[in-house]
């Protein structure tokens, strides 16, 4: 039994990592139970784990996790994989049941922060419970030189949609872009990164006048 946590921004290869993990364990004869959230229908209406290159593996799509404990596929599994973990409100009790009670191996994959750099869902609550935590990075879409992207920036339209709904929206390259710290801060708060103008030098004659009046 073990718990591995894979976190990072969008376009960091998390779905590709899931596919690699699943195929590797299936090649060893393991029964693998893969879960994704039902609200993620970006690429297909079928329950699948899909990366941005459109490679797919079958999964169970659900709005919550605890009811899945009754499914025979779960009971027969040796490895449980949870994708889009940030969307599951019952993530922590489910994972504790899987690992601590049912003694299975579990891999949880999700965004650690939203487009505002706030903790996303219950993902970070799993850090103290994990055997291994891996922070993946994407490549900054602005640098163009392989600089690591730590954060996800929402486009103007997606940000407005999220604010109107009160929750982050599901989207892909049309809605979000991975950025390094510098370009994220530039896009979010350009004023903060604008150098302050040098202090205006007081003309010498003004200083002399001030000194005379002071006397």
Describe each PLM feature range.
Residues 1-71, 114-125, 138, 159-166, ...:
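Conserved P-loop
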Residues 30-33, 105, 132:
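Residues at the starts of beta-strands that form the adenosine-phosphate
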Residues 74-88:
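Conserved P-loop NTPase "ATPase switch" module shared by AAA+ and STAND
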Residues 81, 104-112:
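Structural recognition of the conserved hydrophobic beta-strand(s) that form the central parallel beta-sheet
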Residues 84-95, 113-120:
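Conserved ATPase-coupling elements of RecA-like P-loop NTPase cores
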Residues 96-104:
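Conserved catalytic/switch belt of AAA+ P-loop NTPases
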Residues 132-142:
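Conserved AAA+ ATPase "SRH/arginine-finger" region at the nucleotide-binding site
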Residues 143-147, 183:
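Short Cys/His-rich metal-coordination motifs, predominantly Zn2+-binding knuckles/fingers
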